[in-house]
Curated annotation (Swiss-Prot):
E.C. numbers: 2.8.1.10
Name of this chain's protein: Thiazole synthase
Taxonomic source organism: Fusobacterium nucleatum subsp. nucleatum (strain ATCC 25586 / DSM 15643 / BCRC 10681 / CIP 101130 / JCM 8532 / KCTC 2640 / LMG 13131 / VPI 4355)
The UniProt record lists the keyword Signal: no
Pfam families (UniProt xref): ThiG
Superkingdom: Bacteria
Encoding gene, per UniProt annotation: thiG
Catalytic activity: [ThiS sulfur-carrier protein]-C-terminal-Gly-aminoethanethioate + 2-iminoacetate + 1-deoxy-D-xylulose 5-phosphate = [ThiS sulfur-carrier protein]-C-terminal Gly-Gly + 2-[(2R,5Z)-2-carboxy-4-methylthiazol-5(2H)-ylidene]ethyl phosphate + 2 H2O + H(+)
Cell compartments where the protein resides: Cytoplasm
Keyword annotations from UniProtKB, A to Z: Cytoplasm, Schiff base, Thiamine biosynthesis, Transferase
InterPro entries noted in UniProt: Aldolase_TIM (IPR013785), Thiazole_synthase_ThiG (IPR033983), ThiG (IPR008867)
UniProt similarity note: Belongs to the ThiG family.
Chain positions recorded as 1-deoxy-D-xylulose 5-phosphate binding sites: 156, 182-183, 204-205
Amino acid sequence: MKDSFKLGNKEFNSRFILGSGKYSNELINSAINYAEAEIVTVAMRRAVSGVQENILDYIPKNITLLPNTSGARNAEEAVKIARLARECIQGDFIKIEVIKDSKYLLPDNYETIKATEILAKEGFIVMPYMYPDLNVARALRDAGASCIMPLAAPIGSNRGLITKEFIQILIDEIDLPIIVDAGIGKPSQACEAIEMGVTAIMANTAIATANDIPRMARAFKYAIQAGREAYLAKLGRVLEKGASASSPLTGFLNGVE
């Protein structure tokens, strides 16, 4: 049975979005293939010819590129980077990252809302990275966001679902794809997030810092698939107290001498 999701006018089957920020160009192709990802994020500084070797030469042509506005400190800078990305990559997808906190690398939600509103009006498929907050998520939705991308934990920390309860609120209240971005450190954490009902997972550091990058990419792929199967199957009830036997406790020995 088909189990896809839509962003803008495109449909995707893989729920694993791969970040490319920490790989060598030579390894990115292998990671994509093992992950079977259909969307790959790219920072514009690695995609602009002449700055350094172009990462785009290593990404298969059938992959949807998701440029990000990494380096933007406010809405104005994010909009400039997004427009440059459209010109260079010839696509409308853009991941909004507005970060002026250099210690914790937390997104500036309010500048993100401003950038989202401007870029959505210009026809971009806007995917905003944000700190999970219901009111901000509603504002992003109303501004024209195509999805909501809450962080699980600070960027690059690999600490897992620290914001789990807040992400669950977004799943329950926001009628847009919820894509968990940043902080997922293990395949099991990706599986748990998908079991909760998030649409997809974006991961980068957990894979890029593994000893065996292709194998870790594949592990994340299988974990995300398992989480989705569990979500669709509907998880069994949880007993707060006591126990419930899985086999009959009486009657088996009746009549046995």
